[in-house]
Amino acid sequence: MYLIINKMIYKLFSEENMDYSDIKLNVNINKFNEPELPQEKYGYDFKLNDYRNKIDNINSDNWKKVRWYINEYDFQVKDPIINRAFYKYWEIINEFEIYEEYTEKDVILHCAEAPGGFIQGTNIYLQIEYLNINKDKQIKKIEIDNSGFIMVKSKKKLNNNNYKIYTISLNKELPQYRNYNLPSYNKNIINKHLCITYGKDKTGDMNNLDNIEYINNISKVPFYLITADGGFDEGTDFNNKEQLHYNLILSEIYAGIYLQKQNGHFILKVFDTLTETSVHLIYLLTLCY
């Protein structure tokens, strides 16, 4: 599930002309011996959870293979499209008109993004914007192709193709990550517009806030669009995926709040949102957008 959070307004702070450059947030989630319990008032279903618990009795490798094969959409991706994330992103940016107020001076940040489905989507979208096939200033608002996908809908063409994309993901070349089966950035997304960074400590870890500060320093300007598509293999602990991702999601929210320009857009991937902590994380976003 993705949260599409529009229009950064900095509601956390009362002074309209306040300088935000020196603001630091204390990012921390208390750790408990047992995972936080989901609650019915947030949509938790005991019957569904009983069925999910049965997965624990299945060999994890077999379960992953079966899960892939029973999902009819897992094998729909065809070259040169990198993965299904591209299609998710493509639908989001068109349905919510994310680039409606984008200008040539704006910059984009894609976090936790390898192999680069979202980056590929941004590349293709902005390059289409620059194509001068139709001399008319107006382009049709919306079209659907033969496969049912929304085509680019835009009201304007941009004047040049000097857009800039920044991205950060875990550095798979480091010894501590070599057993994680991390993806590499796909060659189809590498171009002059893309700046790949692994942060101050060269790990690409979003949980190290120094790496977020490093992005702020190299970009020099706040970001029009920030996406956070982070996630990791929960192993055999399927039912606690939500709880296991608390720290990562909080760090991504911190990055969004700290690095976003006013009136910018933030796309955040979350999993289940059935616990008090998840609700608080979402509430934090409502204070700022």
Task: Report each predicted region and the residues it spans.
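Beta-strand-rich binding-surface signature
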Residues: 86, 105-108, 162-164, 220-227, ...
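Helix-boundary capping/turn motifs
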Residues: 81, 226-228, 257-261
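Short interface patches used for recognition in eukaryotic signaling and trafficking proteins
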Residues: 72-77, 105-107, 235-242, 265-272
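Active-site-proximal loop/turn and secondary-structure-junction residues that shape catalytic pockets
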Residues: 171, 232, 272-274
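Short coil/turn segments at secondary-structure boundaries
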Residues: 120-125, 178-182, 231, 237-242, ...
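Intrinsically disordered, low-complexity glycine/charged-rich regulatory or linker segments
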Residues: 1-218
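Conserved proline-anchored active-site loop of SAM-dependent methyltransferases
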Residues: 109-114, 218-236
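Conserved Class I SAM-dependent methyltransferase catalytic core
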Residues: 239-289
